[in-house]
Amino acid sequence: MWKRSEQMKIKSGKCNMAAAMETEQLGVEIFETADCEENIESQDRPKLEPFYVERYSWSQLKKLLADTRKYHGYMMAKAPHDFMFVKRNDPDGPHSDRIYYLAMSGENRENTLFYSEIPKTINRAAVLMLSWKPLLDLFQATLDYGMYSREEELLRERKRIGTVGIASYDYHQGSGTFLFQAGSGIYHVKDGGPQGFTQQPLRPNLVETSCPNIRMDPKLCPADPDWIAFIHSNDIWISNIVTREERRLTYVHNELANMEEDARSAGVATFVLQEEFDRYSGYWWCPKAETTPSGGKILRILYEENDESEVEIIHVTSPMLETRRADSFRYPKTGTANPKVTFKMSEIMIDAEGRIIDVIDKELIQPFEILFEGVEYIARAGWTPEGKYAWSILLDRSQTRLQIVLISPELFIPVEDDVMERQRLIESVPDSVTPLIIYEETTDIWINIHDIFHVFPQSHEEEIEFIFASECKTGFRHLYKITSILKESKYKRSSGGLPAPSDFKCPIKEEIAITSGEWEVLGRHGSNIQVDEVRRLVYFEGTKDSPLEHHLYVVSYVNPGEVTRLTDRGYSHSCCISQHCDFFISKYSNQKNPHCVSLYKLSSPEDDPTCKTKEFWATILDSAGPLPDYTPPEIFSFESTTGFTLYGMLYKPHDLQPGKKYPTVLFIYGGPQVQLVNNRFKGVKYFRLNTLASLGYVVVVIDNRGSCHRGLKFEGAFKYKMGQIEIDDQVEGLQYLASRYDFIDLDRVGIHGWSYGGYLSLMALMQRSDIFRVAIAGAPVTLWIFYDTGYTERYMGHPDQNEQGYYLGSVAMQAEKFPSEPNRLLLLHGFLDENVHFAHTSILLSFLVRAGKPYDLQIYPQERHSIRVPESGEHYELHLLHYLQENLGSRIAALKVI
């Protein structure tokens, strides 16, 4: 028998029952707390009768789900994305630009390339809707589901790609060359370059190859778009799309059947860099070619080489793998060895006719660990605009120290086995050639890697200017324009000895704060800056007006003043700015309205080019309008006892009856780098929450301390103590809502989440079984020492230095604290999960069995960390609804408690 172990107290002490107020600051309806101090005890209220959800059979639930999801498929992936602006340069033509983008084709539901024309003038009395025109003729771009190669499957997991077709493309402005991967091939077409603009769909050209396996990560050479590079079997290859010449550049991987004997890769981002740092490539073309006296050129590629011989191999065995009876992965668990990494460079000598003369593989003049002492992760890399230096953003293992370094190509020498010849090559490099650390920062919390780094063309040989974003200075990510002096190192390689940590550091000449305040500049998941070097402006996305809305802003980076917002409040925006900074596209939505995509023209007075204003120009995708049978949630906030304002969403039951109290489901993520509560449309990704509300559940979502977009102090609250604070915030939010709404039944609360949300669902049942009746945990971490280095050590530190934190944060170690009543715990997990391995669930089950605790389990044999197979997704939602119905919401669930 399950009983409430104690009468719940209302910790937040708030009793304002006023109607919703629209706050001027946020531009979105938010139900706020009041200043009243009395607690509202449950016995002070009239006795309410419980509302029981209708009990459906499995087949009835299946039909109900099908009916509620009929608009869902239409909305998924409908919005265009990955925009590219190209000037038409036609003085007499009606169009100024052509924009290219990826979107879903109506014919075969695949992502493919489209374009639209931007008119030079518009009729302001009417709304112009741009027509979508297919750039490509129809061709088979996608294999049948389940036919992706292992490499493609894993990359799609890391990038969270759920659509089919073309996932991304590369474009070269000068030649008009498009390059993209589709199905098992790499293709190219030309449009918008010297040959003009097509009016008919183009037939893609297959890049022919001798490679027997899948080719990944194709990129155009920016210095010569006839050449492309790609990854084949963990090595770098190049190919000429005109002459069809193909060459393998690196030979580090041997394609051996035994993974233990074949641990090296070139040009490939390893698992942790992809999953935890959002870096998916491991090679970078130099933007400029070096000309040779004979009329040829030298092309360069900087790449990383990884040695994973000391990284543990994880084996996943399943009959569902069909031809592969076992899948094996290199997976560095926290506290164990990461891959050994170094930079190398490939130089390709091209003759005047465009043929390869020679390829030289080069390595650093000294070992990576000597030149870059204490560096564990290559977080980002690239080249300066002139190609004079490669640059890289480097992190130490604890992720509390960041360095930006410049690396001259002169720092690399040809790979040479002969010791004497190698020494001669080393001595030929001047002592003045060393790495240059142009920026360094440290923190006692952690450093969140982002994509904001803009290097200006060098105007002085001895200086370099760049824009970077930092959280370490104020606790909020802001933009800084930094000038570093490229000072020659005092370390002399020829004199022997090792460099000191400070030998390569360059002094900072000037550092200008471009933005400031208790809000953040966005720099991940597609958000980046656009720099207008002509007008000396920087465009960025941020949360200046509200932590719940993303907006586009502009400010001068030379004389920073007031930041100008360019997008409309009341919506959350994701923007793309043209290369000439004369147009921008915004994809925007709010809680009530599905996403819409619009084009805006930017202009400024002639006497003040820094004063930017926008003008609506055209619609690219109109909003679908309110969805039938969809009721958006209400956003609320409350002042937590921790001193922070916490935000949440409340889905009320659709047929709310007075005098009734309703079963409540807390949907949770609660981990870092995610924000669930914001002013965006939730009717697509989180449609199941609306379904629950339609069945008679109250649904609550709360962003606790540790979630993103609230500053480093807010996010860093669970440093060293994951799992120890999040449920306190969630419970306080539930208690606050119960103090405002008597229809919330705190005797019938369930919790559900996936990944970190699954982990916290377990924590909730373990820590507060007096509050949570049912927990449904999907793909949960149960033992932190089983999770990867990059994520776990960032937040929890090294396990040897935080044993108590790892113990308290691991539910498997505390299985005896779970309730002893059946029908309260359901675990869901994909058997092929390569991120949070199924071992997390199996070890928890072992400890639950030892402790004599009941549980229910649902395995998805074909799924990895994300559910991809449509039938699996439907089954998961059915199981979720059925379990909640049988064990929380229905009358039969109440009888089980008695």
Curated annotation (Swiss-Prot):
Entry annotated with the keyword Protease: yes
GO annotation, cellular component aspect: cytoplasm; cytosol
Protein location: Cytoplasm
Active site per database record: 755 (charge relay system), 833 (charge relay system), 865 (charge relay system)
InterPro entries documented for this protein: AB_hydrolase_fold, Dpp_8/9_N, Peptidase_S9_cat, Peptidase_S9B_N, Serine_Prot_S9B/DPPIV
Record Gene3D superfamilies: alpha/beta hydrolase, Dipeptidylpeptidase IV, N-terminal domain
Tissue spec: Ubiquitously expressed, with highest levels in testis, placenta, prostate, muscle and brain.
Reaction(s) catalysed by this chain's protein: Release of an N-terminal dipeptide, Xaa-Yaa-|-Zaa-, from a polypeptide, preferentially when Yaa is Pro, provided Zaa is neither Pro nor hydroxyproline
Expression triggers: In activated T-cells.
Main location, first listed in the record: cytoplasm
Notes on activation and inhibition: Inhibited by zinc. Inhibited by the serine proteinase inhibitor 4-(2-aminoethyl)benzenesulphonyl fluoride (AEBSF), and by di-isopropylfluorophosphate. Specifically inhibited by isoindoline derivatives. Inhibited by Val-boroPro (Talabostat, PT-100), a non-selective inhibitor, which triggers pyroptosis in monocytes and macrophages.
Protein's GO biological process: apoptotic process; immune response; negative regulation of programmed cell death; proteolysis
Single GO term (MF): aminopeptidase activity
Pfam families: Dpp_8_9_N, DPPIV_N, Peptidase_S9
EC numbers: 3.4.14.5
UniProt xrefs under SUPFAM superfamilies: alpha/beta-Hydrolases, DPP6 N-terminal domain-like
Subunit structure: Homodimer. Forms a ternary complex with NLRP1, composed of a DPP8 homodimer, one full-length NLRP1 protein, and one cleaved C-terminus of NLRP1 (NACHT, LRR and PYD domains-containing protein 1, C-terminus). Forms a ternary complex with CARD8, composed of a DPP8 homodimer, one full-length NLRP1 protein, and one cleaved C-terminus of CARD8 (Caspase recruitment domain-containing protein 8, C-terminus). In the ternary complex, only one subunit of the DPP8 homodimer is bound to NLRP1 or CARD8.
Protein family per UniProt: Belongs to the peptidase S9B family. DPPIV subfamily.
Function: Dipeptidyl peptidase that cleaves off N-terminal dipeptides from proteins having a Pro or Ala residue at position 2. Acts as a key inhibitor of caspase-1-dependent monocyte and macrophage pyroptosis in resting cells by preventing activation of NLRP1 and CARD8. Sequesters the cleaved C-terminal part of NLRP1 and CARD8, which respectively constitute the active part of the NLRP1 and CARD8 inflammasomes, in a ternary complex, thereby preventing their oligomerization and activation.
Official protein name in the record: Dipeptidyl peptidase 8
